């Protein structure tokens, strides 16, 4: 009997470690040394962006405008309306364009009433923008290259990127691009489980269908990672846990998880729903880059928390 209790207790501990260790970080934050070049990245599932509130009364917008110091903001589940009674695309641009002159709006739903999808705001030029589309319309991955100016050439590239309404710099500008640090950015919103008040069997079925869709989407993201000529930062709402095949299809062994690398011993829940808490939002980067710090801002403006990382390049 004692032996059986010992085995059960040991198995319980192993399962607990397997479940909670990937949710808790193992590394410690570090302060960049003098001369280290860093980029500050924020990812945030905004849960429809407080779309019924205009900018001055919109908590999400006020947080982005005043509550953090990111160089690049990656937003998922952004919803804007054509009706000026609600939050419009023009409202969003005006509210953040002074702080972030470069942007990428990539909407998976686009009709005569509303737009819904991913948005990137940046202090640096964004070029080579491309959408990775999936069969489910509400989910999308958005790829672009962030061109971080070096001393002496910033004005040239900034002017070219601002003036191009399409993909940004052209192939003829490759000599200019080499004078900059270019990082490929992929921001993601992968398949949701769509859990509601269903019974257990229906929840299992929903999870199974959503998980299969996420794995296929993760393979598409992984293909984009493998084909990148630049170091990458991959962010967003994967809608799956760190133990999942979705996460590992994307991360594999050649990407660093900023939270795991820098936030020793902290529980990394980014989604809170009642008593349920899970880490499903991520900032990953290539091994050529180095996460120095990663924090979760526990602000109550969405059902997700924003995730903020400082990355050396």
Question: Where are the language model's segments positioned?
Answer:
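Soluble or luminal CAZymes and related metallo-dependent hydrolases
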Residues: 52-59, 84, 88, 134-139, ...
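A solvent-exposed, charged loop/short amphipathic helix patch at secondary-structure junctions
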Residues: 195-212
